[in-house]
């Protein structure tokens, strides 16, 4: 075993980054593993050279620290009405509280203060829609922009570097199991890391991880 941790988090997208930020203040030893490149090293040959997709593995657009949305225009929809069904599990009030909490973290790391989709103009459009038997569901949006989105994620990464271990360009090949529980991971290069808690937050690896859960069940 190369090293033991309290927590190993697999996947360096938004979920992995936010999980690490939350746990970093809990006096735990944490390892975050991401198979893609660091956010400022992610390059796409197709975008930079104007050529056809080179089928890079892993793809630097969809993989890497910051996740698939790192190079998006950074729109944060601040409502439980869109983006999933979390409110069905937690209730609307708790979901809205979590949305507000996460939004506050984005602002802390540099997201702009301005929020679109609120105010008198929206109320006016909503009223006009009702006159035509239509229902407008206003959704507040914080627009970071592509460049600022990357900067926000970079600041989060820099914060994490002082609290946790980051292993980038490292693919997890196997979950180590003992006594019916996950005990750690083995990387594609053969390194083994033990842990008490294993968190998998990877979109790309969800099918693989579901198979692991099925084996444990």
Regions found by a protein language model. Name each.
Residues 1-83, 120-123, 127-217:
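Residues forming the flavin
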Residues 64-115:
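Dinucleotide-binding Rossmann-like beta1-alpha1 core, especially the glycine-rich loop
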């Amino acid at each position: 075993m190369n090293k033991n941790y309290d927590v190993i988090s697999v996947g360096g997208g938004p979920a992995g980054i936010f999980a690490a930020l939350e746990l970093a203040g809990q006096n735990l030893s944490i390892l975050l593993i991401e198979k893609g490149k660091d956010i400022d090293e992610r390059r796409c040959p197709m975008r930079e050279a104007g050529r056809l997709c080179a089928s890079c593995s892993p793809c630097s657009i969809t993989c890497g620290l910051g996740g698939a949305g790192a190079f998006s225009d950074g729109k944060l929809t601040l409502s439980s009405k869109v983006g999933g069904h979390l409110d069905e599990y937690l209730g609307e009030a708790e979901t809205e509280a979590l949305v507000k909490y996460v939004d506050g973290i984005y602002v802390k790391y540099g997201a702009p203060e301005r929020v679109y989709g609120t105010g008198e103009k929206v109320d006016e459009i909503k009223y006009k829609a009702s006159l035509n038997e239509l229902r407008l569901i206003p959704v507040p949006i914080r627009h970071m922009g592509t460049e600022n989105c990357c900067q926000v994620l970079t600041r989060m990464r820099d914060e994490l570097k002082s609290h946790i271990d980051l292993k980038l360009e490292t693919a997890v090949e196997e979950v180590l199991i003992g006594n019916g529980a996950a005990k750690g991971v083995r990387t594609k290069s053969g390194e083994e890391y033990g842990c008490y808690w294993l968190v998998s937050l990877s979109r790309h690896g969800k099918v693989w991880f579901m198979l692991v859960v099925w084996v444990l069940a």
